[in-house]
């Protein structure tokens, strides 16, 4: 029985360390990426996974070592994993609608009017096109008011 307790404690410790490592990678990604969309992707995907691993590790630790099952911990695990992606989706959507900068790796998509170009002339044209599309969307959206 004692060896099983030690194995589960080791599994809980590994999950805590793995969750901490993924959170560190998420923090590096938030600092390293260039625009709000890439940063939100790094923040949401990896932080959700890191919180999941960390809370499962804590849950296993408490069940094995103290015999205590926390419903609050389980509810927080479910709540964070449901609300974090939805919240970041809304932030990215608001940034897109307000015309936030979109990073471009290369000029492979020059036909796309939404993407920003590296030179100033195409960049201002792309910004004007995006502003026109936003205005059309607003008119269509608020037409019924």
From Swiss-Prot:
Gene Ontology molecular function: sodium:proton antiporter activity
Any one Pfam family match given in the protein's UniProt record, by short name: PhaG_MnhG_YufB
Primary localization class, coarse: membrane
TM regions (residue ranges): 11-31, 51-71, 72-92
InterPro entries: PhaG_MnhG_YufB (IPR005133)
Superkingdom of the source species: Bacteria
Membrane topology term: Multi-pass membrane protein
Keywords: Antiport, Cell membrane, Ion transport, Membrane, Transmembrane, Transmembrane helix, Transport
Family of this protein: Belongs to the CPA3 antiporters (TC 2.A.63) subunit G family.
Subunit structure: May form a heterooligomeric complex that consists of seven subunits: mnhA2, mnhB2, mnhC2, mnhD2, mnhE2, mnhF2 and mnhG2.
Protein name: Putative antiporter subunit mnhG2
Gene transcribed to yield this protein: mnhG2
């Amino acid at each position: 029985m004692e060896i099983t307790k030690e194995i589960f404690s080791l599994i809980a410790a590994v999950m805590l360390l793995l969750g901490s490592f993924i959170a560190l990678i998420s923090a590096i990604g938030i600092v390293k990426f260039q625009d709000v969309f890439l940063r939100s992707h790094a923040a949401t995907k990896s932080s959700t996974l890191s919180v999941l691993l960390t809370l499962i590790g804590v849950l296993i630790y408490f069940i094995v070592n103290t015999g205590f099952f926390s419903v609050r911990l389980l509810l927080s695990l479910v709540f964070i994993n449901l609300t974090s992606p939805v919240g970041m989706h809304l932030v990215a959507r608001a940034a897109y609608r307000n015309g936030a900068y979109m990073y471009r790796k290369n000029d492979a998509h020059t036909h796309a009017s939404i993407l920003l170009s590296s030179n100033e002339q195409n960049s201002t044209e792309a910004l004007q096109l995006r502003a026109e599309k936003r205005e059309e969307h607003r008119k269509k959206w608020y037409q019924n008011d």
